[in-house]
A protein has these predicted regions:
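Flexible, charged surface loops at secondary-structure boundaries
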Residues: 47-50, 111, 132
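Short, compact, well-ordered microdomains
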Residues: 113-115, 119-147
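Short, low-order "capping/linker" segments at domain edges
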Residues: 120, 150-163
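Low-complexity, flexible helical/coil segments
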Residues: 97, 136-139, 151-157
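A generic "folded-domain core" signal
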Residues: 82, 141-146, 151-154
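Structural alpha-beta junctions
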Residues: 84-100, 134-136
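N-terminal, charge-rich interaction modules
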Residues: 1-91
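Mid-chain, well-packed structural core segment of small domains
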Residues: 94-122
Length: 163
């Protein structure tokens, strides 16, 4: 079994291939492998996300989705833990009066999804929140483009799309 640092780096290498899916009312898919275009920017603006924001999740802390082919029982247990974590994150945001937009991170092949949120917070506050939920990284939008920013993982930030 690979060591924790190796697992972290394997996960980190996958993040730049993520598709961000924003929930209705404005269905939006942002492929982080491609530059952001005017249509995507317009929809982000309609969602109130035309300024810096973070995309983060509470699911699968430390990249814990290590089961390549979980049994139905393992999958049900994982789903239950993730539902509880997501509820805790959303409750914390609501209690703090912080608005959020549902936003899922999806593997490019569509085989993997983590439910998350897009939230307008200062970058360091978003990183601290992600760390509290055991997350390796967040996606950060600086008002122009996205970056991958380490939370628990201490990797240097990477502009997306990768060149």
């Amino acid at each position: 079994m690979p060591d924790t640092e190796s697992q972290t780096q394997d996960k980190w290498a996958q993040y730049p291939c993520t598709i961000l899916e924003f929930a209705p009312p404005e269905r939006l898919r942002i492929d982080l492998r491609r530059p952001l275009g005017a249509p995507e920017r317009a929809i982000l603006a309609s969602l109130g996300l035309d300024r810096p924001f973070a995309v983060l999740t509470a699911e699968n802390p430390m990249g814990e989705n290590t089961e390549d082919e979980p049994t139905p029982v393992q999958q049900a247990e994982s789903d239950q833990r993730n539902d509880a974590r997501r509820g805790e994150l959303e409750a914390e945001l609501r209690k703090s009066g912080i608005e959020y937009q549902p936003c899922d991170g999806v593997a490019a092949d569509g085989e993997y999804r983590e439910h998350g949120v897009a939230v307008v917070l200062p970058r360091e506050q978003a990183v601290m929140l992600a760390r509290r939920f055991g997350q390796l990284a967040i996606f950060w939008f600086d008002g122009r483009s996205f970056s991958l920013v380490g939370a628990v993982a201490r990797n240097p930030s990477e502009k997306l799309p990768k060149r």
